[in-house]
Amino acid sequence: KGPFGAIAGVLAIIAGVVHMVGSSFYLVDPWKRSLWIGLTVFWIGLLLYVRIVKPLFMLRRPYRVAEVRKERGDTTTLVMQPDGHPGFRFRSGQFGWLTVWGSPFKITGHPFSFSSSAAAADGRVEMTIRNLGDFTSGIPKVPVGQRVYLDGPYGAFTIGNPADMHVLIAGGIGVTPMMSMIRT
C-alpha cells in the first residue's frame, strides 16, 4: 500500500521490459516486436486513462450531498446534486461508482445502483445503500454538503421499451434498480 506499492509496480515493469529487451527472444521477429510494442503502448495508455484521465474528469464534475435520508432497516439514501455542472444522464437500472471520502485518484469508489428517476431534470442522483460492511456503515454519517464523486453510468440492466408490460421481482437492497425503473 501507499507509495511503496506504486514504486514497486513501476520497478517490476521496468525490470520486465529490460529482461525482454536483454534476452531478445521476444524481439527477434518484426511481428513479435510489433506485438510487444503494441501491447505495451495499450497497457500504458489504459493505465494512464484509469489513473489520471478518468479521475481528472471526475474532479472537474463533483457532486454535493443534498440529503441523507434514513430508510427502513439499515438502509440510507444519499441524494446528490451536481456541483457546478449539469450532471449526467443515466437509464433506469444502471449503476455508478461512488467515492465519498478522499480524492478520485485513490480509486476507492464503490458501485451502487441509482434509485432515483432517470428523468430528473435538475441532475439529482439518488443511491439507496444498505449497511453491509466497512464503507457502507459510514454512509449514514456523511454530512450534508460533503463533496462526493460519481463515475458512471454503467450497466445494461435497463428496460427496453417502457410501454411494454414488465414484471419486476426483487428483494432486499436488490430492489434499488427497480425503484429507479418505477420512478422513471
Could you say what each language-model-derived stretch is?
Residues 53, 57-149, 166:
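Ferredoxin-reductase
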